Amino acid sequence: MTRLCTMAVTGGVAAALVAHAAAQPLPALETVLGRAGAYVLGLQQQLAGIVAEEDYVQDVRASSVLGPTTRSGLPGVRHRELKSDLLLVRPVGADRWVQFRDVFEVDGRPVRDRNQRLMKLFVTPSSATANQAEQIANESSRYNIGNLLRTVNLPVLALAILEPRQQSRFVFKRIGKGGDAPVRSAAAAATTVWVIGYREVEGQTMIRTTNFRDMPARGRFWIEPDSGQVLASELIAQDLSLTGVITVGYEREPALNVMVPIQMKERYDLRRGPSPVTGEANYRSFRQFQVKVDEKIAPIVKE
């Protein structure tokens, strides 16, 4: 009888604690976005010292590769497998980080001119910072296939939306709680996670076509509200002729104790004609890297 009574009392205390916790107000959306912004700035600094190995598969339906040559200059390529090192760099004098894909194997063959390309990019960079950033983006997309020029297939791209200086360009709204993210991320399924939708509302959009037409971005983030950690992202860029969707999942890397992208999926649909271009990248072998700098090398700036 005593034991039953103790259990009953303990259960009553637990129920009271649960009720008290439930009564605590949820943080405001602005508070969570502020935490997410601070988290993204910190994550950029952490990822700047880390290299990941990327296994990247791209596929194009037959109707998508007829006509002009692909981005790589090879006509009619329908399937591509890339192995790359992925790292975050900061061009000299720039105020933003740029992700660089250093491809070392294409369809099972080593890249022959890899050293020369890196020499041109980092040892003898352009004197114009913006031009150097553009060179990095173009080099990172060098082996993409399909009749679609794109430099947006980089896993941390969507995180820029949450940077404090960028948030005013977007409208945000909480649209649900954790559930199945469209990409691999076990943490994003937790019920405590917020799903926050966003929509770009200002001109001169973050993503633009090669003809400088705006492509307003929209999508969702899976965010842990107390810490601001981003567990998954969805980025949709769209205009009258094209829709691109890029999803990324994040998990903590135990050896480095930092959240890292573990998977990226992408799909591009053209309004007229071609079937979709799709891709899936998985990330592994995360490791610290060291850069030797002399007076001739454009330094990777760390703050």
Question: What are the language-model segments listed below?
Answer:
Residues 1-12:
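Bacterial N-terminal signal peptides that target proteins for export
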